């Protein structure tokens, strides 16, 4: 049986790619850390992989806003590759800065659960007489949520408890039924939907897979600044069935196989 191939995407400012690579390798995957330019230049092809992972850091120095420049590169220059990757049923995860990137690219939370008319219809093309593609039947990715400045107006660097949603359709969180304990480390982690309709849809579809909780060690989870990311449903992770965006830094608490000095 062939192993799962994972691409860990990096660019200027990414600083958690090696931790993410280590975690996937410990789970049995074959992992390549690939700079975005190698995809843009067609030296590497996204379709060669089964999982796309975008790790944390400060991509392009978080100029404009956290993750915005890399999000634009994905949406505007690799949009077709991402569509095919999604429609092939492959998986993706964005962690910390990676979540900011996927959200601002419009890939999460809406793109993965937006079904075209008929299997594979998203890739149908109207062909000219010369066989050149003219148009697609699906509009470009559209941003529905964002992650913005924390209510505390500061960089949050601490540990929090997260309460899972057991009925979530997300493949990444299957089997997680008890609260988990993870670090957060970001200045722009406040989850904001475009409008109340988007938020209600996420709730109805069980797409808010983790929420911050104070039921365990409340003094650790809730400081004077309130939730690290504000009060919008206390959302920390927003998935579709194939993809997951996580604000906490999961790669900073991967302990299996780590040898203590």
What do the PLM-derived regions correspond to, one by one?
Residues 109-110, 199:
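Residues in and immediately flanking transmembrane alpha helices
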Residues 159, 164-261:
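C-terminal and late-domain segments of enzyme folds
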Residues 1-109, 115-131, 135-137, 141-142, ...:
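N-terminal beta1-alpha1 cap of cysteine-dependent amidohydrolase-like domains
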């Amino acid at each position: 049986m062939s192993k799962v191939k994972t691409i860990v995407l990096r660019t200027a400012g990414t600083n958690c790619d090696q931790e993410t690579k280590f975690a996937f390798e410990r789970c049995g995957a074959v992992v390549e850390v690939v700079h975005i330019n190698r995809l843009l230049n067609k030296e590497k092809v996204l379709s060669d992989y089964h999982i796309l992972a975008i790790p944390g850091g400060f991509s392009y120095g978080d100029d404009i806003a956290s993750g915005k420049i890399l999000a634009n590169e994905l949406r505007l220059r690799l949009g077709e590759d991402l569509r095919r990757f999604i429609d092939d049923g492959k998986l993706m995860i964005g962690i910390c800065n990676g979540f900011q990137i996927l959200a601002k690219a419009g890939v999460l939370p809406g793109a993965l659960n937006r079904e075209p008319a008929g299997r594979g219809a998203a890739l149908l093309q109207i062909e000219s007489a010369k066989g050149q593609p003219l148009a697609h039947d699906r509009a470009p990715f559209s941003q529905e949520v964002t992650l913005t400045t924390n209510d505390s107006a500061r960089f949050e660097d601490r540990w929090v408890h997260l309460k899972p949603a057991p009925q979530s359709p997300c493949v990444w969180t299957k089997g997680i039924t008890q609260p988990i304990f993870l670090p957060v480390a970001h200045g722009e982690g406040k989850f904001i939907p475009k409008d109340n309709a988007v938020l209600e849809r996420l709730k109805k579809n069980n797409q808010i897979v983790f929420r911050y909780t104070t039921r365990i060690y409340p003094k650790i989870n809730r400081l004077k600044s309130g939730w690290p990311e504000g009060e919008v449903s206390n959302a920390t992770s927003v998935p579709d069935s194939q993809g997951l965006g996580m604000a906490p830094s999961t790669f900073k608490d991967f302990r299996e196989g780590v040898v203590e000095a």
